[in-house]
Amino acid sequence: MKESVLCVDIGTTSLKVGLISADGEVVFICTKKFKDCYSHFISLEWKICLQNAVKDLHDSGVCTEFEINAIVVSGNGPTLVSQEGFTFLWNEKIDFSVFSDFCEQAQNELKKSLFLPRIVTFKKLYPQYLEDKIIFSGPEFLIYELTQKAVTILPEERFISAYWTNENLSLCKIDFQKIPPFIEIGKICGKLTKSAASYLGLPSDLPVVSGGPDFVAALIGTDTLQNGTLCDRCGSSEGFNFASSVFLQDKNVRSLPSVVKDLWNASVLIPESANLSKKERLLEAKKAIDILRSLAEQNKVSFPAKMTATGGQAKDLSLLKEKSVVTGMQIEICQCADAELLGDACAGFTALQKFENIRAAAKKIVKKNSINKELL
């Protein structure tokens, strides 16, 4: 039988599941919508949706040809989930008034971190912080349900300021014993427990692998891991992500480390772009690319003539055609529009030691096709 990994990505409104082989064949894919996206216990739906997806997978018959060698989990963040499943989603408001409760040093750390302000808000607003022993990020909660192993996925060591250190947790009066230890992307977190295996209808002792935050999984799944590559991650919101060997700084740009040690990711975000008119959306896309191109030129970094589109809007070929014309960029799409799943596959096969590292896995697994020949 051919080797494959079961890729799971937790979104805000749905769970996406794909079965992908080591050479990038997307054997099976499905989406399971959540019943109540606004519930504070939405995380309890994740395993149910995964069970339903696995049932569809078995019903499809592909498992007679492809063996599942691992499960990989990625998901939205910075979502927080208590041990009993109480969920504080990434898009819920932070109570910034709590900053005044801390010393100046702690306030500075809160401003740097994506997670600390949310943990502090969670602690202040919800009794579940005190009642439960562990506080997880989103995908790590599902990993815990599958393995009973508590971890926090750190995409790369330079992300530490966006997460936390024990010193920063102490400064912000957060009990570090509630926060699971870090693990890298593409590592085996644990094995599927007998009860989880029975629930899902999968073999017990199946490795469960860290896929990481969804935006990082998407960058891996579009192979935006080389200097001078560009990805348009477009859904309800939109982000243009440029991989650079130079740290690019601008008031309109958010720069974070790449999952690859010698690169940075510079991004321009368009919040709620799906709510804009098509004309507004395209003009904002052009503006974002112009910002990144200008910044790259100022720093003598080569800027590409093409970009890879992923996400919901990437399934709209008519929109992509217009975007290509307006932005002057050639556009490529991957064999799976939901590149997070491809990124999960890269993490999974790296953990299984089929590839030396994530970058090598992406080179083999990610396939791209230009839309321009067909549409322009």
Stretches found by the model and what they are:
Residues I10-T12, Q107-P213, S277:
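Gly/Ser/Thr-rich active-site cleft segment
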Residues Q51-N69, L125-Y129, N168-F176, L200, ...:
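Phosphate/pyrophosphate-binding loops at sites that engage ATP/ADP/AMP, CoA/4′-phosphopantetheine
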Residues S277-Q335, E340:
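Activation-segment/catalytic-loop signature of the eukaryotic protein kinase fold
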Residues A217-G221, I270-P271, K321, E332-K367:
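Glycine-rich phosphate-binding/hydrolytic loop that grips phosphoryl groups
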Residues L80-S100, F136-E140, E145-E167, L206-E280:
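Glycine-rich phosphate-binding loop of actin/hexokinase-like ATP-binding domains
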Residues T64-I119:
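Active-site phosphate-binding/coordination module
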Residues M1-G85, E131, S198, L206-S210, ...:
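N-terminal glycine/serine-rich phosphate-binding loop of ATP-dependent small-molecule kinases
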Residues V73-P78, I185-G186, C234-S236, A305-K315:
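Glycine-rich beta-strand-to-loop/alpha-helix junction loops that act as flexible
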